[in-house]
Amino acid sequence: MTADHNRALHDAPTARGGEVRQPDGDYFNALQTEVNDKGFLVTSTEDLFQWARTGSLWWMTFGLACCAVEMIHVNMPRYDMERFGAAPRASPRQSDVMIVAGTLCNKMAPALRKVYDQMSDPKYVISMGSCANGGGYYHYSYSVVRGCDRIVPVDIYVPGCPPTAEALLYGVMQLQRKIRRSGTIER
């Protein structure tokens, strides 16, 4: 695992004293304080767009191998990713998040780039699994791209072989945090 993967694993919320640490607790506490003081919120249009964007991620699957099965699990009733504001779409023109899951071969790399270019701005990429992150088990094969970040810019790396549905869900929540704190409409 690389340093990015270790960082992703250690940024997870942990239990301290029987209480689960909320990753965005300070953000929501500040909003609650402002609403309690004034009874309303004053914000900029840009902040409103950022807030709306975090709750309406439309993602498309680019399932290339066995990690795609875990993407299916995340949409089933047990996890139901739509509760977190992420809904699947079939067309790249309708989606703003691409989840690349599985081994990316040299022949498939131009197709991945073409689909990425068809997405509307702002667009985000989640790299799911060891094969998409760095080639994985097939790293030394002549036909494997050693990480989809060589073809498209990646925002979130989800480690594992295959990563669990919980790990992908955590990656989506990390992407929502990243969008919320980016501070600009354009990426």
UniProtKB/Swiss-Prot annotation:
It catalyses: a quinone + NADH + 5 H(+)(in) = a quinol + NAD(+) + 4 H(+)(out). It is an enzyme of class 7 (translocase). Keywords: 4Fe-4S, Cell inner membrane, Cell membrane, Iron, Iron-sulfur, Membrane, Metal-binding, NAD, Quinone, Translocase, Transport, Ubiquinone. Binds 1 [4Fe-4S] cluster. Residues 1-10 have a biased composition (Basic and acidic residues). NDH-1 shuttles electrons from NADH, via FMN and iron-sulfur (Fe-S) centers, to quinones in the respiratory chain. Couples the redox reaction to proton translocation (for every two electrons transferred, four hydrogen ions are translocated across the cytoplasmic membrane), and thus conserves the redox energy in a proton gradient. This is NADH-quinone oxidoreductase subunit B. It comes from Erythrobacter litoralis (strain HTCC2594).
